[in-house]
Amino acid sequence: MRRRRVLVLGGASAASGAAYWFSGRSSEELARDERDREAVDTERDDDGSEPSDEDGSADETEPENGESILADSKGMVVFTYDDSPIEDYTLAYEVHSEYDVPGCTAACPGYMKRRDDYLDPDQLREMQADGWGVMSHTYRHRSLGRIGLAGPAHAGDDRLSVEANRHGAIEGDPLVVFDDEGETAATVAGRGSDSSGQYVELEAPLSEDVDESGYVRHPESFIRDVLRKTDAQLEAWGLDVTGFVYPYGRYHGVAEEVVRDRYEAVANHRYGGGHNELEGLDPTAMRRRYVETDRATEDDVDAFMETAADEDVLAIVGAHTQYDTLTEQRVRYTIESALEHDLAIVTMEEALAELERR
């Protein structure tokens, strides 16, 4: 696609009354949980070993002579696609290329290395050389933020009742179970659900009681190691990493501090919105708007783009190309709506560079 510098099309009116937030889990998210449980993916190399290097490099896409990428555009919008499934290449990249506009892939390199339904490094290198951005999404889609307990945990228990069992996805992962009075360490043995709700199984019984007001999370040092490893692998493949997207939108607790300390931009620091006011903007505390068909109507998309054009904001949209609810038609419609509202479709790296010029 070799990047455009200015994107300007005729304006169009848009419907109003967008619903700017969607909560709850879609059927596709539930299906992905099932695929993750079934996947043969038992590697345990989060111990600091360096990933092997491979040749490859990403072309520079900065505008020449420092000119603005906005020109006559009314604003900026960043398209973010999560998880790095193969559909990022076969669907999103193909459609974006037709319009000569970029997107950003939030990549999970641990899945890219091992699973055929994910991008391979050559494909992602091709995309970045053609103007796409690459963001970190953890090595194997780990939930980083704390999750509340659904009941008290007692010394001797080998199972935690939790509001969501995200932390139980990868056997052997370390955990911290804590409340206002203290904390205790644990190790993941698995996860599941029954008539009482979701749970995380532990390799060994807990050594201390934890109140039902408590939480479970990964240790801070482990979170830092996972992020370092994620970026190291992507960079070893010749990719430039700009920014972060939280898996499952789980950002609460110590993870927030770790992520904001490491990355210069976070696309989903909080739920909802997607219009990030430029005045006083902290790029590590941004929000985005999902555009899958079960989360937004065409009127919602148009209203979102209209607001992005009318107000002084950086707009961010998010989507999952592996979901049935993100159709080719919806990708096209969202791109066309942005262009019809005279918005420049940019990568996160380009958006940050533009912010520095202001």
Predicted feature residues:
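N-terminal secretory signal peptides and thylakoid transit peptides that target proteins
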Residues: 1-13
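C-terminal segment of N-terminal export signals and the immediately downstream linker at the start
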Residues: 21-73
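Active-site beta->alpha N-cap acidic-glycine motif
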Residues: 59-170, 174, 184-185, 226, ...
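Catalytic grooves of carbohydrate-active enzymes
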Residues: 77, 83-87, 297-349
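Acidic (Asp/Glu)-rich catalytic clusters
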Residues: 93-100, 116-136, 259-260, 276-280, ...
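His/Asp/Glu-enriched short active-site or ligand-binding loop at hydrolase and phosphoryl-transfer sites
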Residues: 107, 138-142, 250-251, 255-301, ...
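Interface-prone segments of viral and bacterial extracellular assemblies
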Residues: 149-154, 166-169, 207-214, 220, ...
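Small/polar beta-strand repeat architecture
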Residues: 184-222
